[in-house]
Amino acid sequence: MELRDLQIFKCVAHHKSITGAAKELNYVQSNVTARIKQLENELKTPLFNRHKKGVSLSPEGRKMIEYVNKILKDVEELEQVFLDTEIPSGILKIGTVETVRILPTIIASYYKKYPNVDLSLQAGLTEELIKKVMNHELDGAFISGPLKHSILEQYDVYTEKLTLVTSNKTFNIEDFSTTPILVFNQGCGYRSRLEQWLKDEGVLPNRMMEFNILETILNSVALGLGITVVPESAVMHLAVQGKVYCHPLPEKDSCISTIFIRHKDAYLTNSMRSLLKTIVEHKNMSMA
């Protein structure tokens, strides 16, 4: 079993396609197929289910990908240990939920100080990003907190108010039973907070409509399609124009924190150490 075989396996699993992996790796398709087959023969088990639309991981393949992610991350960190210099450089793969308002400020400040670092940013939902950090697919992520997890370190970034957003000036709790609620997909911290609030109030929502993009949710609310709950900072540009109206949540449900997480067993490169320093600096500035 060679390291390259594991890299090919991971690429096929990511694309769910032999063709897609071959294109990314600049291999002929038959070569990728042969390497996967050789790997399956060595392990004496099928790693993929083959079907007309491509491939998907078999139960054994799902076990395999967890080990492969860790092995490849360890190799990457081993290389980084010997390449790491006093000047931060290399690649940092960072995930973020869509509504982190302070992210552009943090990234701009970081890039200005450390231009040799290539930052790769990936948007996602909180639960999805947690999983990717745990599997070493991301070096870290900005997510909704708080979080309790034994293998993840977390750093406070900031805390802000959540607000209920409607197209009407007035709102009653009973409106949840008659008006569609516009939310992100399952795994979003704001959605979880909203669902807990409704559960505490004993309210059965009329209907949940799922979206992937924040601006689509907000514009849909402005058009009267439904109501939503998001951080205040994410909607103020529409509120000041009178396109939507913001209503306070109960005090116990009104605040949500943004935290930065990283795997506690991951090698702490100078690039990551400098990012953590930048996050702390901006937190201190916001509290001043």
UniProtKB/Swiss-Prot annotation:
One of its GO terms (biological process) is regulation of DNA-templated transcription. Disulfide bonds: none annotated. Residues 18-37 bind DNA. The keyword Ion transport does not apply. One of its GO terms (molecular function) is DNA-binding transcription factor activity. It holds the Pfam family HTH_1. Residues 1-58 form the HTH lysR-type domain. PROSITE patterns: HTH_LYSR. Keywords: DNA-binding, Transcription, Transcription regulation. InterPro entries: LysR_subst-bd, Tscrpt_reg_HTH_LysR, WH-like_DNA-bd_sf, WH_DNA-bd_sf. The keyword DNA-binding applies. Belongs to the LysR transcriptional regulatory family. This is HTH-type transcriptional regulator CzcR. It comes from Bacillus subtilis (strain 168). The lineage of its organism: Bacteria, Bacillati, Bacillota, Bacilli, Bacillales.
